[in-house]
From Swiss-Prot:
<feature type="topological domain" description="Cytoplasmic">
    <location>
        <begin position="1"/>
        <end position="46"/>
    </location>
</feature>
<feature type="transmembrane region" description="Helical">
    <location>
        <begin position="96"/>
        <end position="116"/>
    </location>
</feature>
<feature type="transmembrane region" description="Helical">
    <location>
        <begin position="138"/>
        <end position="158"/>
    </location>
</feature>
<feature type="topological domain" description="Extracellular">
    <location>
        <begin position="159"/>
        <end position="183"/>
    </location>
</feature>
<keyword id="KW-0472">Membrane</keyword>
<comment type="subunit">
    <text>Homodimer and heterodimers.</text>
</comment>
<dbReference type="GO" id="GO:0005886">
    <property type="term" value="C:plasma membrane"/>
</dbReference>
<keyword id="KW-1133">Transmembrane helix</keyword>
<feature type="transmembrane region" description="Helical">
    <location>
        <begin position="47"/>
        <end position="67"/>
    </location>
</feature>
<dbReference type="Pfam" id="PF04535">
    <property type="entry name" value="CASP_dom"/>
</dbReference>
<dbReference type="InterPro" id="IPR006702">
    <property type="entry name" value="CASP_dom"/>
</dbReference>
<dbReference type="InterPro" id="IPR044173">
    <property type="entry name" value="CASPL"/>
</dbReference>
<feature type="transmembrane region" description="Helical">
    <location>
        <begin position="184"/>
        <end position="204"/>
    </location>
</feature>
<dbReference type="GO" id="GO:0048226">
    <property type="term" value="C:Casparian strip"/>
</dbReference>
<keyword id="KW-0961">Cell wall biogenesis/degradation</keyword>
<feature type="topological domain" description="Cytoplasmic">
    <location>
        <begin position="117"/>
        <end position="137"/>
    </location>
</feature>
<keyword id="KW-1003">Cell membrane</keyword>
Amino acid sequence: MSSGANATTIDVPETRAEAKGKAPLIAAPIVATTKATPHPNAGWKKGLAIFDFLLRLAAIAATLAAATTMGTTDETLPFFTQFFQFQASFDDLPAFMFFVVATAIASGYLALSLPFSLVSIFRPHAQGIRLLLIISDTVMLALTTAGAASATAIVYLAHNGDSSANWIAICQQFTDFCQSVSGAVVASFIAVVIFMLLVMMSALALRKH
């Protein structure tokens, strides 16, 4: 408090409430939380990857059965002459040998592709793996189809012959031989169908939307 000649002033200290009122307001910090949301296409792409893996296992069985059945096909008739022995073997015909090589290569490729297919199950949006698989599957599809088609032509001639070329049907004599090669051809076409499904599924998985 101070006094003067004409006026008297009294200094009143600010109360705690008034001091609080003049204090600057500090806003409470806002914490933004983000929650990872799953990709809308992750579910069906993972399902495709699982189905892809199972189809590859089935294709391995089909190509391996085709290669081993054709590669072990051999039949010798119980009768023979002094100069001839009637025998039929897969390695007598280049088409059957190409069939064995083609299906064996396809079987080996399918076994090597299983780890990549397994990775696609856990990473369904990995585009690079899918692109590699679709290119490789297309090449193997062409190779398996070529082998199956060449063997089919020989099997048809073995069953029916060709009168214009004087080729007789041999399946009436070599029954077991014809049954084995026919079964191998059927197994190879099953593998061809599976390869077609694999290519279509990979193309579907590569779609962005």
